């Protein structure tokens, strides 16, 4: 497993490979998936965290069943750009995943992703109970969509045949 920049991931991905977005929390891991064209992020499921070995296996099972080519994981930065208190835990999670998978990870600034997800769910008139169930996968979707937008921009600037 390697930690890549988004630019490095753009170079390593083959056409029509999906990537997953992760919103790592203390109690849950929100998951989202891209389409094969890597244009759209869709909220998927939430893994209830137990302990690392169980969490990692659940994530790897998801990756295998969805044919994931890589992960974009939210990095919880402070608004001033400094490392937030959960950055160290996120980096440790990825370091531990190095022992479990060869799939690459990209860190993606997740500032305001949960706020944006909450706002979207409110606008969709989702009940409070349903919002609580869906917020983590929705936040993962916002994280992944940001990375997908960047990948699309990189493809256009390279004259990639798959760009819009």
Swiss-Prot record:
Signal peptide: none annotated. GO terms for biological process: rRNA 5'-end processing. It is an enzyme of class 3 (hydrolase). CDD domains: YqgF. It holds the Pfam family RuvX. GO terms for molecular function: nuclease activity. Its EC number is 3.1.-.-. It is found in: Cytoplasm. GO terms for cellular component: cytosol. It comes from the Bacteria. InterPro entries: RNaseH-like_sf, YqgF, YqgF/RNaseH-like_dom, YqgF/RNaseH-like_dom_sf. Keywords: Cytoplasm, Hydrolase, Nuclease, Ribosome biogenesis. Could be a nuclease involved in processing of the 5'-end of pre-16S rRNA. NCBIfam families: RNAse_H_YqgF (TIGR00250). Belongs to the YqgF nuclease family. This is Putative pre-16S rRNA nuclease. It comes from Rhizobium johnstonii (strain DSM 114642 / LMG 32736 / 3841).
């Amino acid at each position: 497993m390697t930690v890549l920049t988004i630019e490095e991931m753009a170079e390593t991905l083959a056409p029509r490979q999906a990537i997953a977005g992760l919103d790592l929390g203390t109690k849950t891991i929100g998951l989202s998936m891209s389409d094969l064209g890597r244009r759209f992020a869709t909220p998927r499921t939430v893994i209830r965290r137990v302990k690392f070995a169980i969490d990692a296996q659940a994530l790897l099972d998801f990756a295998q069943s969805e044919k994931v080519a890589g992960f974009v994981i939210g990095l919880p930065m402070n608004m001033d750009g400094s490392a937030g208190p959960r950055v160290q835990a996120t980096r440790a999670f990825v370091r531990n995943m190095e022992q479990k998978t060869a799939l690459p990870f990209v860190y993606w600034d997740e500032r305001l992703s949960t706020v944006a997800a909450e706002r979207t769910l409110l606008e969709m008139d989702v009940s409070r109970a349903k919002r609580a169930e869906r917020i983590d996968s929705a936040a993962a979707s916002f994280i992944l969509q940001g990375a997908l937008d960047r990948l699309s921009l990189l493809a256009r600037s390279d004259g990639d045949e798959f760009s819009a």
